[in-house]
Design a protein with these regions (language model features):
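Hydrophobic residues within well-ordered alpha-helices
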Residues: 34-36
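Non-catalytic, C-terminal membrane-associated alpha-helical segments of glycosyltransferases
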Residues: 62-132
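Acidic donor-binding loop at a coil-to-helix junction in glycosyltransferase catalytic cores
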Residues: 16-30
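Intrinsically disordered, low-complexity segments enriched in Gly and acidic/Ser/Thr residues
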Residues: 58-60
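Conserved nucleotide-sugar donor-binding
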Residues: 1-12
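Short Asp/Glu-rich motifs
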Residues: 54-55
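Catalytic beta-strand/loop signature of glycosyltransferases that borders the donor
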Residues: 13-15, 39-51, 63-64
């Protein structure tokens, strides 16, 4: 995608998604989805453009309740019609790596569903917990 095409179509990163925001990840996914929805030609090229130290993170705290809630919100932002189906497919496909003794598949799916619905009603994980 060319920069001028992005500007012409007024595609921007979502301010609610990404490190330091209400929903801790997914800004890149939503950005690319928006480019495709606008009909822009998106391609990938397998070049290494950066090296990132993955040993510590200021926002990723593991596969905890917020992770699954935010994952549901991401899929809610991606698609009203197919978002929940896609979310369930991703959770099922990655069930061996995402779930552990602390959070079961069933619990993670329930949290993701809450995030999916919560996003539609502007309820973040923090607001949800404040109301409980």
């Amino acid at each position: 995608v060319k920069n001028k095409s992005i500007k012409r179509e007024n595609v921007i990163f979502h301010r609610l998604f990404g490190g330091g925001t209400d929903y801790s990840a997914g800004e890149d996914t939503l950005f690319i989805a928006d480019l495709i929805k606008k009909g822009l030609k998106v391609y990938s090229y397998p070049a290494n453009i950066a090296s990132v130290d993955q040993s510590t993170s200021t926002w990723f705290k593991g596969y905890n309740e917020k992770f699954f809630y935010d994952k549901g919100a991401l899929f809610g932002a991606l698609s009203k019609r197919y978002g929940w189906l896609l979310c369930r497919l991703v959770l099922w496909k990655n069930r061996r790596s995402l779930f552990n003794a602390n959070i079961s598949y069933r619990c993670g799916k329930k949290l993701a569903k809450a995030g999916f619905v919560g996003f539609r009603h502007n309820v973040t994980y923090e607001r949800r917990n404040d109301n409980e």
